Curated annotation (Swiss-Prot):
Protein source organism: Rickettsia akari (strain Hartford)
Disulfide bonds: none
Function: Catalyzes the transfer of the diacylglyceryl group from phosphatidylglycerol to the sulfhydryl group of the N-terminal cysteine of a prolipoprotein, the first step in the formation of mature lipoproteins.
Pathway per the UniProt entry: Protein modification; lipoprotein biosynthesis (diacylglyceryl transfer)
Gene that produces this protein: lgt
Designated name of the protein: Phosphatidylglycerol--prolipoprotein diacylglyceryl transferase
Binding site for a 1,2-diacyl-sn-glycero-3-phospho-(1'-sn-glycerol): R138
Residue spans crossing the bilayer: 9-29, 55-75, 92-112, 117-137, 172-192, 201-221, 228-248
Coiled coil regions in record: none
Family (UniProt): Belongs to the Lgt family.
Keywords recorded for this protein, A-Z: Cell inner membrane, Cell membrane, Membrane, Transferase, Transmembrane, Transmembrane helix
Length: 259
């Protein structure tokens, strides 16, 4: 299959380039905020709309700083050690989900400590909305022709312009489907049908567990980052970083279920 050659830049505002990648973050945050408000309206959990509004700034800082530093420290430290100014070039891409997740967790902890909010009540709502951003982010990765999959002989193999011109798995679309759409549906069903917000920590546990399972599985089809390659013979950095998420998620599910 031929890669649909979509310009990563949507338009320019003077010298400022508006990219699909940047837009995915902005739209993802806005849609997540809107959806979180709907959840609060329906279930009236410990978190109210004013608290959520106050947390948005913390969340944005956590996503951007955590995501960028996670990528810098985990995936390409040598480049940024030699060229530290490049750390600020977020418009070039290079964000780590695991780093962004940790950034949001730290931001949530600091916010809850300052405003005396229950930490897991907040993360349960965050967990329900994060797949929206994941879906849009992976679509943006696909448009950029980055984070593509391994070489395949399958008929749906795609030739990416920034690769070696061999047909590869469109793993960004796999991740958009499972980590975005499927995970969103799982958490929406749990939240609205099973009323999981009543069990503090359950939504957080479900998100961590299913995200980790999907990520570990899809990494089998995704090309390892060239600057890292495989770790321990055949594991990728994404798989290794997902293991603690799986353990913590399983623990939260067990702890949150009523006896």
């Amino acid at each position: 299959m031929t890669f649909p050659n979509i310009n990563p830049i949507i338009f320019y505002l003077g010298p400022l380039a508006i990219s699909w990648y940047s837009l995915s973050y902005v739209v993802g945050i806005l849609l997540s905020w809107f959806y979180a408000n709907k959840i609060i309206e329906k279930f009236k959990p410990q978190i109210n709309k004013k608290t959520l509004e106050d947390f948005i700034t913390y969340a944005v800082i956590g996503i951007i700083v955590g995501g960028r530093l996670g990528f810098v420290l985990l995936y390409n430290p040598s480049r940024y050690f030699l060229h530290p100014i490049d750390i600020l070039k977020t418009y070039e891409g290079g964000m780590s989900f695991h780093g962004g997740a940790l950034g949001v967790i730290i931001a949530a902890y600091l916010f809850c400590r300052k405003y005396k909010v229950n930490f897991l009540s907040l993360t349960d709502i965050i967990a329900a909305v994060v797949p929206i951003g994941l879906f849009l982010g992976r679509i943006a990765n696909f448009i950029n022709g980055e984070l593509y999959g391994r070489i395949t002989n399958a008929s749906f193999g795609m030739i990416f312009p920034n690769s070696d011109l061999m047909p590869r798995h469109p793993s960004q679309l796999y991740e958009a489907f499972f980590e975005g759409l499927v995970l969103f549906c799982i958490l929406a069903y749990a939240t609205f049908k099973n009323k999981t917000l009543k069990n503090c920590g359950l939504n957080s546990g479900l998100f961590l567990t299913f995200y980790a399972l999907f990520r570990i599985a899809i990494e089998i089809f995704r090309e390892p980052d060239i600057q890292i390659g495989f770790i321990l013979d055949n594991l990728t950095m994404g798989q290794i970083l997902s293991v603690p998420m799986l353990i913590l998620g399983s623990y939260l599910i067990c702890q949150s279920n009523p006896k």
